[in-house]
Structures are given as C-alpha cells and as structure tokens.
C-alpha cells in the first residue's frame, strides 16, 4: 500500500484498459478528460496502451497530446485533463475495434497482471477495471472464467466473491462464471459458510455489522419445505445458523423473488445470491449500468464497470463512461480502509 492511502492523502488507482477492441479505451479517455473532480479523491493512471488511448482520445474529440507514458506510478502528476499511461507490452493500435482478437484478449490479461504486480509491490492502492472480453481472452489461451478469477489467482486467494453494488446495496455471489448446473453443485456447505463469513467481515469492516446478511433461496419459494428441493433446508439454513452462532448477523434462506425487491427498497444492505443470474438479473433490471462490481477477498480494492465490451458500438465514441466513473469513485472511497476489509476477511475465512 502506498503512503497515499491514508486519511490525509488520496489513494493511487490503476485503471486497466480492458479489451482494446471494445469500449474500454474510449470510456477511459472520457473519464480522464471529463471528470477532473475524481482527481481530488484519487491519483489516476492507466495500465494499458498509450497509442490505443491516443486514438480513443481523438475519437471522442480530445487532444491526443494529453496522453503521456510514465514508467512508474510515482511519476504520475494527476494533472487535470492528463492521461498518464504505464505501457504494458507492445502496442495494439492496429487491432480493429469491434472484432474478437487473440491479441486484444492477451493484452487485456497483461494489463490486469501488470496492475496486480504493481499492487503486490505496494505501488498502487487499488485497481479499476474496464471490461475485457472472455472469448478473446480464451482465444489467447487464457482460460479464466473472468476478471474475478484471474485477480484471485494473481493474489493467491481462494475465498473471494463478486459483489454488485449500487448505493448502499451489496449483492455477493456464492458462485459466478459457471453453468447453472455447476452452480447448483457448487452451492455446498463449505462455500456458503465461506461467503457468509466474507460478507459478514465486509459489513463489519464498513461499520455495519448490525445489518444482517440476507441469503437468497436457491430453489423457488426457498424450497417450500422440501417440495421444490432440499438444498435450502439442508445447506443454506444450516450455514445461516452457523453464521449467527459465529457472531455474523444473517437471515434466510429467503425466497429470491421476495428478497430482491425488499433489498432494492432498502430493507437489506448485504445480500448473497446463489448463482450469477440470480443476482445480476434483478440488479441490472433496476440499476442498468449505474452500478459497479467489487471483488471482496483481495488484498487491494478492485472495482469494475458492470457492463461488457460492447463491440457493437466500440470505436464510435458514443459509449457512456458513467459506470467507470462510479467504479473509480467507489474504489477511491474504499481504498483508504481496505486494509481492514482484507484483514477482517482473511482472519474469518483463512484467505
């Protein structure tokens, strides 16, 4: 952790460029050119490709001369309107927008691993990620299901969760980028206990241990007393009971169709979804792209946009940067206290 991540100094955040064939470059350019208020809360630099960013700046009507290559985070001046880039690998400026490319997939992974190395060396306090494309990443031979799993590997952690957030709502996911069939298999006692501990430690670190963690039922009607499946009674309910016995305020399982409307209305601040679409579908129905994706369980804060690469509009300069701005704001907010989040999570889950 850098000395900037203290109450009196702003944190240093690395923005990874994502897939260069997607909208990552242009939303990064728009954020850094048009939202200088962010620089009062964080020192911002990009890990990616300077030439690609120069193209993106030009596409959105800016001056490509604003892009400057730096060698280390310490060189970042954070001046208004500046785009300071740590060049990670060869230029991919020749990659056409809107097309799947192994080169772009490889680059997107390289930007993340470079940022993780900077974090491990204590040179940055957090990572903000523009979207990568899973198909392109796989074309390049990187078989990670997504950003979250790649980051967990880079930091050597086994217990982590993808968390969607908007305002004061945090939706943890017990499983993420696997088939629904596999997700049901993965909702086992060990995983549910681990995610409950992770969510509880996160709530405690935020000073909200008095807010219960609500667990969504896996089956319709949370199983309806075993009529629609036994997992809720045999796996989820015992995990909730154990969490309460350990001092983690928890509730559930609660039928998902009741829980998520209640959460949106403010009854629940911390929710655990059993599988990807159980959490993502209601969240995006309400918040659209006006939310962020936080990875809880890493030693540094990582916040991402909650949308994809949008190949259909890439390179046209029309993509909205709102979610990336929200991600940077949330990372800047969480970074100064993230050490407590990490230590609390590690002590309760074993990493």
UniProtKB/Swiss-Prot annotation:
MF terms in GO: metal ion binding; NAD binding; oxidoreductase activity
The residues that hold a divalent metal cation are 177, 221, 276
> Which of the seven top EC classes does this enzyme belong to?
oxidoreductase
- Can you quote the record's cofactor note? Binds 1 divalent metal cation per subunit.
Binding sites annotated in the UniProt record for substrate: 147-148, 284, 293, 302
EC nos:
1.1.1.408
Give the required cofactors: a divalent metal cation
Superkingdom of this entry's organism? Bacteria
Looking up InterPro entries in the UniProt record yields: PdxA_fam
Keywords (alphabetical) are: Carbohydrate metabolism, Metal-binding, NAD, Oxidoreductase
Which PANTHER family would you find in this protein's record?
4-HYDROXYTHREONINE-4-PHOSPHATE DEHYDROGENASE, D-THREONATE 4-PHOSPHATE DEHYDROGENASE
What NCBIfam families would the database entry show? pdxA (TIGR00557)
What this protein is reported to do is described as: Catalyzes the NAD-dependent oxidation and subsequent decarboxylation of D-threonate 4-phosphate to produce dihydroxyacetone phosphate (DHAP). Can also use 4-hydroxy-L-threonine 4-phosphate as substrate.
Give the record's subunit note.
Homodimer.
| Family indicated by similarity | Belongs to the PdxA family. PdxA2 subfamily.
Q: What is this protein called?
A: D-threonate 4-phosphate dehydrogenase
Q: Which species?
A: Bordetella bronchiseptica (strain ATCC BAA-588 / NCTC 13252 / RB50) (Alcaligenes bronchisepticus)
Q: Which gene encodes it?
A: pdxA2
